């Protein structure tokens, strides 16, 4: 397995590099950064090698400048984490125009070098996923973003804590924008296979408070420690494992939709997808209730507006 991380010197990129390097499937890990970050990346490589000492990992780690991307050839997955980081008080959409130029540049270069899968992490992730898809001209199954996968995990944890059950008993997800217009799917939430609405405590569930906490978790972490890294890195690892092991799990990622949800088209947005060796094998259409459809359509319209603005940058 060969994985490339573009933007590996950043918080999420470096944390992801460590987690991936520890995996037994990892053979070649390529860390890409701008020229001024090469020393930091070389230090990261040596630090990771120290962490791997005495483990079963035999990953080869390579460091290269983004001026020489030929090294990414034959990568199974290219992860893009590059971009201007979000600061406290800054919305994800504020980042769109600046980061679109960065992501678009890399997407074009990747497409020139290899036929691979592009996994976008850069925020606002739905808009950046669309930009990477448009500029790479890859098939829709090859380009996807982290989307609301981490948001869904945070929501799952909150539900488990409220009902006092093991997290594995909870099945739920959040769709839509990775941002303010995200949509929790209570209609598709269950505990131990039982619809959540059938539990007596459901009427006490502070759903608005929980969703607000999920929405602002990233900003909370930025305020407390400068930025998140471990949560996103673990979520990224989940997705890469699905690809490597051809797990065909249903994850909520940012994917291009073409009418699967209420006729919405030409936008990348967080939806349930079946993910395996070929990337997105299927955008899984599910039945939403009336309020969820309205909220999802609103979310798609918000993303689409920004996609149109950055499409030709």
UniProtKB/Swiss-Prot annotation:
Positions contributing to NADP(+) binding: 7-13, 34-37, 99, 121-123
EC number: 1.1.1.375
Gene3D superfamilies linked to this entry: Lactate dehydrogenase/glycoside hydrolase, family 4, C-terminal (3.90.110.10), NAD(P)-binding Rossmann-like Domain (3.40.50.720)
InterPro entries for the chain: L-lactate/malate_DH, L-lactate_DH_AS, Lactate/malate_DH_C, Lactate/malate_DH_N, Lactate_DH/Glyco_Ohase_4_C, NAD(P)-bd_dom_sf
Compartments (UniProt record): Cytoplasm
Reactions mediated catalytically: a (2S)-2-hydroxycarboxylate + NAD(+) = a 2-oxocarboxylate + NADH + H(+); a (2S)-2-hydroxycarboxylate + NADP(+) = a 2-oxocarboxylate + NADPH + H(+)
Family to which this protein belongs: Belongs to the LDH/MDH superfamily.
Main function: Catalyzes the reversible oxidation of (S)-malate and (S)-sulfolactate to oxaloacetate and sulfopyruvate, respectively. Can use both NADH and NADPH, although activity is higher with NADPH. Oxidation of (S)-sulfolactate is observed only in the presence of NADP(+). Can also oxidize tartrate. Cannot reduce pyruvate, nor alpha-ketoglutarate.
Protein name per the record: L-2-hydroxycarboxylate dehydrogenase (NAD(P)(+))
Organism: Methanocaldococcus jannaschii (strain ATCC 43067 / DSM 2661 / JAL-1 / JCM 10045 / NBRC 100440) (Methanococcus jannaschii)
